[in-house]
């Protein structure tokens, strides 16, 4: 039986929690201001991981429910947030879970919803939203080429020569297709940030990417060492420019 690709991050809960990138707080401020999330409102987070995009919703005072497929990730969420009275989580599959008629003012995800088949994702979200409720889909785009083109070329050469994964990323999800499923597109909003890593830090960060977690064993050492050595040759620093994006829809 083929292993569920959606569980790839569940194999590294502690590393995922430490090294996965957090979003710009301004993005979450925008979501709260636009959707009115707060006490008396309800929200559902699809696939929270270990809480990279959970604090703002929990701290808003809204009734927060997360649905997480990975049991180890769900355990990490409970460890971090179970002391909050408005925090709830189910370890289940969003595609099939019975929410018992519950409806939400906000449903959101951070780089998670694209792991669900598009028709299922949008249709279920539409059914689970209250009239006037919102869908917020967050993602991050990053690049390091502009800061150091020579380093970028060296790292790409390592990818070309050494990268061999058991799980290529082949998800197909269009963030602009919500209108086909009865949702009204509001806007796409972007925020920007910057981060730096040493060679060793970057190795840890890369190890949280789905395709890198699933690297073939014989490729792991030459690939990670090759990227690490390239960064060391360029001052032991790699700089990423990040774009934090949210696609916002409304029901009704």
Question: Where are these predicted regions, by residue range?
Answer:
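Conserved class I S-adenosyl-L-methionine
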Residues: 1-38
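Class I SAM-dependent methyltransferase SAM/SAH-binding core
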Residues: 44, 50-97
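Conserved Class I S-adenosyl-L-methionine
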Residues: 50, 167, 172-252
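A short acidic, Gly/Pro-enriched loop at the edge of an enzyme's catalytic core
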Residues: 97-107
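Short catalytic micro-motifs in class I SAM-dependent methyltransferases
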Residues: 111-112, 139
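A short, conserved alpha-helix within the catalytic core of class I
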Residues: 115-125
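Conserved catalytic/acceptor-binding region of the Class I
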Residues: 126, 130-195
